[in-house]
Amino acid sequence: MKKEKRQRLIKQFVKEYEIEKQERLVELLAKKDVLVTQATVSRDIRELNVTKVPSQEGLMIYKIFSEEHLQTDIKLKKKLREVVVKIDCVDQLMVIKTLPGNAHVIGVLFDELDWKEKIGCICGNDTCLIISQSKSDREILEERLNLII
């Protein structure tokens, strides 16, 4: 099996299904008569910029990110670790307290990521308010941030 075809199938499966484990990808590939090991799938996942993110149901599933999206994600992780002082949450609101002069940077990075759980954000000098549609959406954002920080 050619690597390109196998990786094309992996991309297709990740887009079509909520896949939690690499073993599931091995099973789906086998149904297409593509026999591979979990180690091969693991290498393919790295090469394809596939990463785990929380699903609507709170499960950690694989998703493919573009290179641009991946760079923004890396910038957000770095900045959050450097400048976040405290995160408070209530209902569908998340308040991120930062070192002075840094809240707007966090807001810009959140906007660039365009996470569907976020309706918008309002930032001042040292505080960024992230607004979600619902408490469950905010909890997904909170889980993502906790994985980062």
UniProtKB/Swiss-Prot annotation:
InterPro entries: Arg_repress, Arg_repress_C, Arg_repress_C_sf, Arg_repress_DNA-bd, WH-like_DNA-bd_sf, WH_DNA-bd_sf. Coiled coil: none annotated. The keyword Chloroplast does not apply. Pfam families: Arg_repressor (PF01316), Arg_repressor_C (PF02863). GO terms for molecular function: arginine binding; DNA binding; DNA-binding transcription factor activity. GO terms for cellular component: cytoplasm. Keywords: Arginine metabolism, Cytoplasm, DNA-binding, Transcription, Transcription regulation. Pathway: Amino-acid degradation; L-arginine degradation via ADI pathway. It is found in: Cytoplasm. Signal peptide: none annotated. GO terms for biological process: arginine catabolic process to ornithine; protein complex oligomerization; regulation of arginine biosynthetic process. Gene3D superfamilies: 3.30.1360.40, Winged helix-like DNA-binding domain superfamily/Winged helix DNA-binding domain. Regulates the transcription of the arc operon, involved in arginine catabolism. Belongs to the ArgR family. This is Arginine regulator.
